[in-house]
C-alpha cells in the first residue's frame, strides 16, 4: 500500500509547525500525525475529523493531539484522568468518584459541557461500545475506563461537532484514541504513586511484547492497576457536609442519629406540632417530655461515611495482528479484554416519611419504645445497620477483524467487523428491607421492635438488625455488532491540487439490558429503588466526503498559502 500515493507525495512538502498549549498541567501539542514509508517518503494518513488521507498536519477542524511522550509526562494513570485535564471537557462529565451514580465506576467525556452522550468516543477510528448502565438512568455513554492506558499511542480530540462525518453522536465533538499499530521488542513498565498523605497508593504494571516479520507484525500487552480508596473525611475540604465554616451551606441530612420526631397538628396528647430532637446520648428510652423539651432537627453528617475515591483493581490484555495477504491486501485483528472491580461506600440508610404516604418513616403507637402512645412520624438514620457497600465488576470484550486493500493506483479500501460486549454486576450490601422495617417499627415486643430513640451503636440487638439487612443485585449488559466498509482516493487533478473523495457504509445492531433485583424493582428497599429496562436498535448509515482544493502549491497567490473546501454528507436510519 506504500505505492498508492508515492508519486504525489514526492511533490508535497510537510510544513513542520507545532504549537504548545498548556492547561492544568498537561502539555497539549499539535504534533504531526504523519507516517513515513521505508524510503522516508510521506504516507498520507487519516486524521480525526476527516475520512480522506492526507499528509497535512492539520485538518479542517480544530484538533488537540496528545502523543505518548506527553501522556507519560502528564502522570495520568487512566485515559479518563488524562482527558479530565482538558479545559474543553467540563460540565456534564462524571468519573468513578461520582457518588449516587447510576453507572458506578465509569468515566466519561463531555466536550463543551453538552453532556457525555453528545461526545463520540472512537478507538482507532471505530466506535467504543456504550457502557451497560446509563448515567442518570437516561444518558448513554462510553466509559473511558474500558481502554488500557498501556496501549494508547496518542489521543486526538476534535473540538467541533462532526455529525456529517461520524453521525449524530458527534454533536459536541469526537475523542479518537489511537492505539499502537506496530511494536517490536519487549517493554516492561512498573510504577507506584501516592498522595502526600500516603493513603492512596496506586500500582501499575504492564508488559508489551511485539515482533515484526516479512509478512506482518503483532504485539500483545498485559496490564494491571490497583488503587487504594480514600474516604471523604480523609481530606479537610470534604470531611464534613457542613460547609458554613468555609462560607458555604450546611448540606447535612435531616435524617440523623439520634433522629427527630415530628408532632402533627391535633396531637392526642396536646403537644405543639413541630420537630423535636431525640436527646444526644440517649440510650433508647427517653420520655416524651425529654424529647418535647428539645425542639428542632438532629442533622446527620454523611460525609465521613462516604467514599471520595473508590478502591480500584483493573487488569486485562490487548493484542493486534497485521498480516500481509498479498501485495494489495493486509488483514488485521485487534482484541481487548478488560476486567474492572470497584468498591465504594455510602452513608447508612435514611428513613423519613409521613402518615399520608404509608412509607417507612411512620412510628406506630404500637411500637414497644414509642413514648407518645400515638402514631407519629420521624427522621432517622440506621447507622447500626452499617454503611451501604457497593462492589461493581465490569467485564469488557472487544474484537475487530478486518482487511485493508488497494483499489487501483490511488484508492484504498477497508472493511471490518466490530464486536463489543460489556457485562456489569453491581452488588450492594447493608440495605434495609422496607417490609421488614415497617414490621419492626410496628412490633410491641421489645425483642423484635426497632428502637429509633437511641444514639449510636448498641441500641438494637443484632437479631433485629440482621432481620432488616438485605442485599441488592443489578445486572447489566450491552452489545454492539457493526460492519463497515469504506474507501478513499483521488478523483481528478485540479489547478489547486488533487480532488479527493471518501465513501463508506456501515450497519450496526445494539442491544442493552439493565435488570435489578426483585426487591429494588418493587420499591421494597428503604430510600432506594430502581427500574429495569432492555431494548435494541439497528442503525444503517452511508456517507461521502469530498476535499476540493482551490489554491495550492501550483497556483499559489500572494497572501494565500492554501485554500480548499471540504464537503461531507451522511444519512442514518435508526430502527
Regions picked out by a protein language model, each given a short descriptive name:
Residues 1-85, 147, 206, 210, ...:
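N-terminal Sec signal peptide and the immediately downstream disordered periplasmic leader
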Residues 136, 228-230, 234, 240-245, ...:
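Surface-exposed, low-complexity loop segments enriched in small/polar and acidic residues
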Residues 79-82, 86, 109-110, 142-145, ...:
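N-terminal periplasmic accessory domains that precede
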Amino acid at each position: 500500500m506504500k505505492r498508492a500515493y508515492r508519486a504525489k507525495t514526492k511533490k508535497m512538502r510537510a510544513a513542520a509547525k507545532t504549537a504548545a498549549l498548556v492547561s492544568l498541567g498537561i502539555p497539549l501539542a499539535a504534533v504531526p500525525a504523519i507516517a513515513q514509508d521505508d524510503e522516508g517518503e510521506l504516507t498520507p494518513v487519516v486524521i480525526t475529523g476527516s475520512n480522506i488521507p492526507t499528509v497535512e498536519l492539520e485538518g479542517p477542524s480544530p484538533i488537540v493531539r496528545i502523543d505518548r511522550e506527553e501522556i507519560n509526562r502528564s502522570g495520568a494513570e487512566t485515559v479518563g484522568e488524562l482527558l479530565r485535564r482538558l479545559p474543553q471537557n467540563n460540565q456534564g462529565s462524571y468519573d468513578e468518584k461520582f457518588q449516587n451514580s447510576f453507572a458506578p465506576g465509569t468515566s466519561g467525556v463531555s466536550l463543551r459541557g453538552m453532556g457525555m452522550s453528545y461526545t463520540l468516543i472512537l478507538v482507532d477510528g471505530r466506535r467504543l461500545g456504550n457502557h451497560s448502565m446509563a448515567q442518570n438512568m437516561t444518558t448513554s455513554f462510553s466509559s473511558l475506563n474500558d481502554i488500557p492506558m498501556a496501549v494508547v499511542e496518542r489521543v486526538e480530540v476534535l473540538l467541533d461537532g462532526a455529525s456529517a462525518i461520524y453521525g449524530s453522536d458527534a454533536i459536541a465533538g469526537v475523542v479518537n484514541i489511537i492505539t499502537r499499530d506496530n511494536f517490536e521488542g519487549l517493554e516492561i513498565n512498573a510504577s507506584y504513586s501516592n498522595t502526600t498523605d500516603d493513603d492512596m497508593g496506586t500500582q501499575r504494571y504492564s508488559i508489551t511484547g511485539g515482533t515484526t516479520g516479512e509478512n506482518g507484525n503483532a504485539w500483545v500487552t498485559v496490564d494491571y492497576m490497583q488503587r487504594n480508596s480514600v474516604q471523604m473525611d480523609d481530606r479537610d475540604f470534604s470531611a464534613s457536609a457542613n460547609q458554613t465554616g468555609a462560607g458555604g451551606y450546611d448540606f447535612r441530612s435531616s435524617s440523623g442519629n439520634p433522629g427527630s420526631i415530628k408532632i402533627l397538628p391535633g396531637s392526642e396528647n396536646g403537644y405543639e406540632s413541630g420537630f423535636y430532637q431525640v436527646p444526644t446520648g440517649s440510650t433508647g428510652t427517653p420520655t416524651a417530655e425529654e424529647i418535647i423539651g428539645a425542639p428542632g432537627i438532629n442533622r446527620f453528617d454523611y460525609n465521613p461515611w462516604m467514599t471520595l475515591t473508590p478502591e480500584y483493581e483493573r487488569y486485562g490484555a490487548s493484542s493486534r495482528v497485521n498480516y500481509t495477504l498479498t501485495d494489495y491486501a493486509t488483514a488485521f485483528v485487534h482484541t481487548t479484554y478488560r476486567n474492572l472491580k470497584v468498591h465504594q461506600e455510602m452513608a447508612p440508610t435514611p428513613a423519613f416519611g409521613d402518615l399520608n404516604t404509608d412509607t417507612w418513616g411512620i412510628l406506630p403507637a404500637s411500637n414497644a419504645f414509642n413514648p407518645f402512645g400515638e402514631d407519629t412520624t420521624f427522621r432517622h438514620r440506621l447507622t447500626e445497620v452499617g454503611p451501604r457497600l457497593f462492589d461493581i465488576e465490569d467485564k469488557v470484550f472487544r474484537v475487530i477483524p478486518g482487511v485493508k486493500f488497494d483499489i487501483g493506483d490511488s484508492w484504498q479500501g477497508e472493511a471490518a467487523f466490530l464486536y463489543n460486549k460489556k457485562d456489569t454486576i453491581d452488588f450492594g450490601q447493608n440495605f434495609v428491607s422496607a417490609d421488614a422495617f415497617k414490621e419492626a417499627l410496628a412490633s410491641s415486643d421489645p425483642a423484635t421492635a426497632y428502637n429509633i430513640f437511641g444514639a449510636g451503636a448498641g441500641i438494637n440487638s443484632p437479631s433485629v438488625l440482621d432481620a432488616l439487612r438485605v442485599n441488592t443485585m443489578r445486572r447489566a449488559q450491552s452489545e454492539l455488532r457493526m460492519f463497515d466498509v469504506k474507501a478513499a482516493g483521488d478523483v481528478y487533478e485540479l489547478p489547486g491540487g488533487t480532488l479527493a473523495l471518501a465513501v463508506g457504509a456501515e450497519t450496526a445492531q445494539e442491544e442493552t439490558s439493565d435488570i435489578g433485583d426483585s426487591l429494588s424493582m418493587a420499591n421494597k428497599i428503604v430510600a432506594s429503588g430502581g427500574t429495569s429496562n432492555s431494548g435494541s436498535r439497528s442503525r444503517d448509515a452511508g456517507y461521502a466526503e469530498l476535499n476540493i482544493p482551490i489554491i495550492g502549491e501550483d497556483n499559489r497567490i500572494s497572501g494565500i498559502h492554501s485554500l480548499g473546501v471540504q464537503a461531507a454528507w451522511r444519512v442514518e436510519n435508526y430502527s
